[in-house]
Amino acid sequence: MGTTLAEKVWADHLVRKGSDGAPDLLYIDLMLMHEVTSPQAFEGLRLAGRKPRHVDQLIATEDHNTPTVDIDRPNPDKTSALQLTTLEKNCKEFGVRLHPLGDADQGIVHAFAPILGLTQPGMTIVCGDSHTSTHGAFGALAFGIGTSEVEHVMATQTLSLKPFKTMAINVEGKLPADATAKDIILAIIAKIGTGGGQGYVIEYRGEAIRNLTMDERMTVCNMSIEAGARAGMIAPDETTFEYLKGRPHAPEGELWDQAVAYWKTLKTDDDAVFDKVVDIDASTLGPYVTWGTNPGQGLPITASVPEPDKIADATKRAAAERAITYMGLKPGMPIKDIAVDTVFIGSCTNGRIDDLRQAAAIMKGHHKAENIHRVLVVPASSRVRLQAEKEGLDKVFEDFGAEWRNAGCSMCLGMNPDKLVPNERSISTSNRNFEGRQGKGSRTHLASPSVAAATAIRGTISSPADL
């Protein structure tokens, strides 16, 4: 019997096979780090008198707590400032490469690494961050870990893990012109639920997936965790190789040829058997938006807010009632009737150059609606920012009435100055719409950059077709 992509990468990194139910010992190629989940790990290393086993395989950046304006001024939030200075001190003490705020390569941890060519097919990649699954778009086995595991990887460059189950999600057919990668993953999560992928590595397959750019593939893999999965992967192909070629950390010359030869072997065998298979017809998809307080509460933009009294399952009915109350909605109201206060375009889900181009193409020649308080456009990395400015996208955003910011996690989460106030409603290209995710009492609707841009123009949740 053949093996899946995930099983092949696992086998290539197996240091020791566990016996009698014990976990395997897996070698880790690359660990990415940021200011939030690393302090205790560094302290543990310090107290044990250890040094990193392979410091050249550890790379850090500042992203979660960083301001996206006035980055040359002192951080007014003392806790955030402490976390940032602590990371800088720890990296200096232990010799870990750091891309700090203001550095040309600084950015969200899951955005700067692919751009630099650090993320490559067949690698094992970890980070103390759940959205590490983003890197699976390259055919890497990438997943988030806890702080104690961060320390373990620094000390040993390995992790003890039991093999994950495997799931295939086949997205066959052609994606309609008004549908995007974000709509694919929101539709998947709406179908299988936020726990549907629990314990699995999801491999995204099919014509619609193969036709995506690398930026779009990263969007899909990024939200694997919102489906409950440990990781998401897409088999590398010519699109992957073209993206990587010539990047700072990509192999060169003969090493490039050798790497590509290996990368081409990283695909699921025809006779491999997945533990679970889900099929999606891409031709039926369109713009999706979340209405509730978890990423699985999503619907086509043409739908209406669910009516709880029509939901048979008592648990789901109660969840819908709570979400509708928190979000300040009415059962049965059309999604397109929902007025929005703030628009956020950015995050490790949708802050890449393809995303910014998508939004700019829709915003060009328009101005934000009067009821929209603010539109924040935040590139996922400093390199994305520079590329966008080279293309004149920043001018498009500013003419539209949007704020063009520096790179960072920004309004994806309430850990930096970019927050919503209680009851403020946003449409956001980020990945989570939990209660209070964007600030205490915040109300978040997840959507693609194109839907976010159209919403900013009309003031109510809209698709480009509504313009």
Swiss-Prot record:
Catalyzed chemical reaction(s): (2R,3S)-3-isopropylmalate = (2S)-2-isopropylmalate
EC number: 4.2.1.33
Quaternary context: Heterodimer of LeuC and LeuD.
Cofactor binding comment, as recorded: Binds 1 [4Fe-4S] cluster per subunit.
Residues given in the record as [4Fe-4S] cluster binding sites: C348, C409, C412
Disulfide bonds: none
Protein's name in the database: 3-isopropylmalate dehydratase large subunit
GO molecular function, one term: metal ion binding
Organism: Bifidobacterium longum subsp. infantis (strain ATCC 15697 / DSM 20088 / JCM 1222 / NCTC 11817 / S12)
